[in-house]
Design a protein with these regions (language model features):
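Short, non-helical or kinked segments that cap or interrupt transmembrane helices
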Residues: 1-14, 25-29
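Active-site nucleophile and cofactor-binding loops and adjacent substrate-binding regions
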Residues: 7-9, 34, 132
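Membrane-embedded alpha-helical segments of transport systems
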Residues: 7-15, 38-42, 174
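Hydrophobic alpha-helical transmembrane segments
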Residues: 18-23
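Glycine/threonine-rich beta-strand-loop-alpha-helix active-site module
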Residues: 26, 30, 34, 192-195
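Membrane-interfacial segments at transmembrane helix termini in multi-pass membrane proteins
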Residues: 30-94
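Structured cytosolic domains appended to multi-pass membrane proteins
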Residues: 75-253
Length: 253
């Protein structure tokens, strides 16, 4: 979705430039060319981040008939629910917490609640970082904008390539509304429609807490084996409410 939006932005710029040529309006030509060029560059960069060609993305290469892979043995497909209290205990005694935001965070408008939770953890001496996937959300830079709105420090927001090696050394990764960008099938399942797409290595963290409303699939339309992982627990409900409940439990510790 972010790639398509940036592509539409590029096409809008080119349309404005074409209109400027028709009207002999230099300002429209220059502005349209700038918007078109920037949109084209951004589209290309994001397509590379997904390891997909732009035509494949536009043609609906995701979720349009791919097999919903499980990424492992289908014999054990149960999820392990958790509570706000248990999640708070896990994070309060962690060596580090990595927050992985996704579109669900944007829908719930949970960025301020997440910032409050992170502040509480930092006051307890627990470092908090944010792992940002380049195509998380519904537009380019979506997660960066939301977190900046909540006054999250820029240095705490880490790009995928900068943070991926840290998951293996992290006690808790908390996934808030992210799905496809954390799906290990992209790394492990050659038959998956997202195979080869770079992902955040959330599954390598010692424990994972996933905040979701339900078990529905993400934009790619496939299941996520991460949710059934041995070290993964699920906290179901509205992300903002769940994060606020975790924060209240942290205050009591």
């Amino acid at each position: 979705m972010p790639v398509v939006i940036s592509l539409l932005n590029a096409m809008t710029g080119l349309s404005a430039a074409a209109a400027g040529l028709a009207l002999n309006n230099t300002a429209m030509i220059v502005a349209g060319m700038i918007v078109g060029a920037s949109g084209s560059i951004l589209t290309n960069l994001m397509a590379k981040a997904m390891n997909r060609s732009i035509p494949a993305i536009v043609a609906g290469g995701f979720g349009g008939g791919g097999v919903a892979v499980s990424g492992g043995d289908d014999g054990d497909r149960t999820v392990k629910p958790t509570s706000a209290a248990d999640a708070a205990i896990q994070m309060a005694y962690a060596n580090q917490v990595i927050v992985v935001p996704g579109y669900g965070l944007a829908v719930a408008q949970a960025q301020h609640a997440v910032k409050d939770m992170a502040t509480m953890l930092e006051n307890k001496g627990v470092p908090v970082k944010y792992a940002i996937h380049p195509v998380a959300g519904r537009m380019p830079g979506h997660m960066n904008v939301l977190l900046a709105e909540a006054d999250v420090e820029y240095d705490a927001m880490k790009e995928m390539d900068d943070i991926n090696d840290e998951f293996g050394r992290t006690d808790v990764a908390i996934v808030i509304g992210a799905n496809d960008v954390t799906n290990p099938a992209a790394r492990n399942e050659p038959n998956s429609p997202i195979y080869g797409m770079p992902i955040l290595n959330v599954d390598k963290a010692r424990s994972v807490i996933v905040l979701k409303r339900s078990m529905n699939s993400g934009f790619a339309g496939i299941d996520n084996p991460l949710f059934y992982g041995e070290g993964t627990t699920m906290l179901f409900g509205d992300a903002k409410k769940s994060v606020s409940e975790v924060t209240e439990e942290l205050k009591a510790l």
